Structures are given as structure tokens and as C-alpha cells.
Amino acid sequence: MKNTRNEPLRFAVLTDTHVSPARAAVVEQLGRTYAALAEMAPDFVLHCGDITDTGLPREYDLYQQAIPAALRGRIRHVPGNHDVRWDPTAKELYQARLGAARYSFDAAGVHFIGFDPTQPLLEPGHCGRDGLRWLDRDLARLDPGTPVIMYHHFPAGPGHGYIDDQDALLDLLARHGVRALFAGHIHQETVTRLGLLTQVTLTAFADGPSCYWAETDRAADGRPELAVSRLALTADGTRERHLVARVPLSGSSPDSGPRRPRRRARASGWRLRLTGSVQGGIAAAGSTAIAVSTAGQVVALRPEDGEVRWQARLGPAYRRAAFDGAGRTVFVPSADRHVYALDAGTGRIRWRFDAGAPVLSAPLVAAGDRDEHVVFGAGRQLFAVAAGTGRLAWSVPGRGWSAGRACSDGRRVYTCAADGYARAHDLRTGQEAWSYRMVTGDEHRVALYSGWDCVVALGAGTVIVATVCGSQALDAATGAVRWSFPDSAMYPPAVVLGDGTALLTSEQGTVSRVALAGGEVIWQARLGVRLQKAGPVVAGDRAWVVSEAGTLTSVRLADGHLSGSRQLTRARCFCAPAVADGTLIAGDQDGYVHGIRLT
């Protein structure tokens, strides 16, 4: 690799290969493209993510088999959302196959940064304070005037909302004078000038073989620049270049006009900031609420004013904790491969269970005839451990993974998984009672469209499960389908109301109250906002719905009348809320826990 400023730099860039067994033609063409690039002898190749289509081990196998020997060790990767969203290892597999997800290196006087704003289990990106601090430190150590080229998966700037905290990212890049940003994700070629920064988004390789060639050059005034061209590799071996952009690597910024002012949420109630993002959901019992963060912070709060009663530091948590029936122990799932049992009054660890894989599902505390069990998924295994001791009661290996949560009626446990099945297991032994196939197709399709993130609901002998495409009500005794519903209640979970009805909330923002017996719609309310994992929580005669955009809306249970909408936060919300002591508690991607008095 060239390491002096006097030598021209030549490298290739591509993105969105979406390798999978179902895309044999793409894999074959990728091998030919990499072979052709090897003949052109670039200094290195950059890949802007969505390397695989689902993050499956077989997809990484196929991708790595397409790389010729001449390019091995010379391709620099960053992950895309398709590489991590359906990955039960929380990026462990990616790092084992392709190395670090964020890093930097120098070549020919240019500093390159591979950045990673992707998040396990989610589509959007989020840099977070930790990511921005890492980036700031990396840039701060450079000599003044060093050209910087960054590449990651999501585009940023006007018209793009793929990164939660893109304003903070763009401010940082502007402050350090970063010159170029390569991105993918949108499968389109665009060139955008943002002050000193030139952002180039690339067409997707999977949509038709395409890659890009970049060379350092000199502008007419002698200043250094980067010439970026689309590279066409024809069947007869011809290589054609079509200029896309010339990126200045020095000079001052053109006037980009006034910056949009930062929006701030309206102050209301209380809020507390944790490290990392709060996206796992809030757990509440009595007068204690538990918030967990992706940085591993666990905080016990007093609902009425947000006073911190205790806090602990564990591994990253992406799903909500759970209390035992007495409210004395709280169980925290962690991507560090453990479930922790903490004393709810002090935060002291009572026991920890090593699941052998990241615990990305929410634990369920299921009360049987004699004992309570903590039921959760880790990797492709379902576990039940004794709530009091943490000893393994039973496990079911060889099933699909899950980021959702099971439910139980005290006799059985009902689950959904990424292998496309809903199942019932005996709570005492783990023996399977029935299974229902929710999705058919190859491994890739099942992984994408299964109930991998379903929070199973139960009421009146009816089990409500959901895939990306719709919801089904199953007979709890037999697994037979009682009725189906066209809207998916997977991301915003279904809520059983206890009177023979349930709330089914779609990702598109429609709340439906339905009869559990036959699925008849009692009323529907359209919120006009997108919902994800946050969804509704019931308090008294109302459901309170937190949207992805941070709005809070009241829905009257009697008739679906909407009222009381307010902006809870300007950050994105994927955190399931809870209500305790008349206070609604929710978390956001910026790490804030918000408390709003409802009475």
C-alpha cells in the first residue's frame, strides 16, 4: 500500500452486494468483478456494507469464496443493516469473518476511516456518544490539512433520515474538515456537497454489477482532488470509466448557507441520561422502574421523579428486563452472553447464567405450579432457568433465534423464532406440545419474514403471534389457527386487555381493537406516525402510544378516540414504555429516560 504523499492513490469502492444462496448470479458476477479489479491492481478496495443479505454464516462463506487470492487482505469492509439486523451474535459473526467494524488507516498522505453506525436488531443507524467520541479522537490526532475520506453504510444530510443522530455526525465532520464520504443503502448514485464534505452514494452491486474507481489527481489550479468514476466491466473484458465526481481534497468551504437549528423536545416531567441508547424497554414493578442501555448501564428509578435508587454496569442490553412475581428480583438480558439476576432493592448480583451466545431476547418470568422460571432465547436455543437460583431447568437446542419474548399460561410457554415457527413447550420440562409454521421458503426468506422479533401475547386461550407480513391467533391448546389479521403486530407488540379483546398495532401506525374469540374489529384508529418496538402501554381507560419519531398519543379504549398528542423527545424511540405510579416512562436513542405524569 502506498504511504507517501507523492504517489497517486488508486482504489475501488462498491456496496450492497447482498450475497445469499438465492442470488447465485450475483455471487458469480461478484467473483468476476473482484478478479477484474485484481488485474487493475488497486491499492485497496472499500466495501460500504450490506455485504450479505441476512448475515447468515452461509452468506459469509459465499462472499469470501468470491474473493480472489490477489485481493485477500486488501478489501476494507464496514457492515450494513442487512449484515447485523438479523444476526443473533450481535456482530460477533461479522467481526470474526471480516474484522473490526470501525477503524482507520493512512495511505499516500490520505487518512481513511471505516465507520459503523449500524445497530443490532434495527434498520436505522445510530452513532451514539461512544461512536462520535471515537471518531472525534481519531480525527483530532491528524496533522492539520490531512485529507480525510470516510466510508460507512448510511448516507447523511438533507433528505436522509437513516442515522438517528446525523446532525451531530455532520457537525463533527465539518469541524474536522472531512473531505469525502462514501455510502450505500439507498441503491442510488448521488453526489451531494455539504460544505467541505462531498458525499457520494453508490448504486447497489446486487441490482446490476457496479463498482467505482477513485484516483487522486490534480485540479486545474494544481490543488489535490479525488476523481471518482463508475466502472463498467463488460463481457469482453473492456473497462469503461464514467466520471461521477471530483472531490476537492484541500481548499476552503463554499458557503452552504445557515445551518438548520437543532430541535429540542418540549420540557415536561423528568428525564435522565444513560450511557448508550435506551431501546430495550422499561420494566416496572410497584414503585420501581428499571431502564437498561446498549452500553450496559442498568438503573433503578423512582417513577414519580426519576430519582436513581441504584445503578449497575453489565454487558450491552438490547431488550427489556423483567421482574419476578414478588418484585424482589430483576432479570437483565445481555449481549455479553449472560442473563443476570439482580436484587431489585440494591442492584446486587444474585446469580448470572452463561447462555453461550448473546442474549438478545427479552426474558419472561413464568410462574408454574411450584416455581418460577426465567425463559429466554440465546443463539438458536431456548432456555428455562430457575428464577431463584439460576440453575438450568431445561433447554431446547437447534431452533431459530429470537429477539422477542415468550408468554406463558403457567402450563406452557409460547414462542416465535427466526426459523419460521411458533411453538408451545411444557413449562416444566420444555417438551414441545405443538408447532405452527408461520413462514415458508428458503432460509433467507424465512429469516427476513419470520416472527424473529415477536412479543407473543396470550388471552382467553388464544395465542397472538406475528410475522413481518401479518398476525395470527392460534388456539393455545392445539396451535390451530383461529383467525388471521392483515396488519403485523410484531414490531409494536400486541396487548391483551383482559376483557376478551386485544390491541393490535401496526408498524404503519394503525391501532385496532379486536375480539380474541374471532378477530372481529371493534374499532381502528390511525395515528399517522410510524411505530417500531415502542408501541402502546395501557393505563386505566387509555392506551398511550410512543412512536418512532418520539410522539406520545392517547387512545381511548372505549372507541379509539385520539387525544393528548405531545412530543416526548426528538430522538428516535424503539423502547417499549411502562406505566408505574401514574407516570409513563420511556427511553430514546440518545440515551434519555423520560418520565411523564399521566394523572
What kind of region is each of these model predictions?
Residues 302-305, 343-346, 386-389, 426-430, ...:
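Short loop/turn segments that connect beta-strands within beta-propeller blades
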Residues 32, 190, 195-264:
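Binuclear metal-dependent phosphoesterase catalytic core
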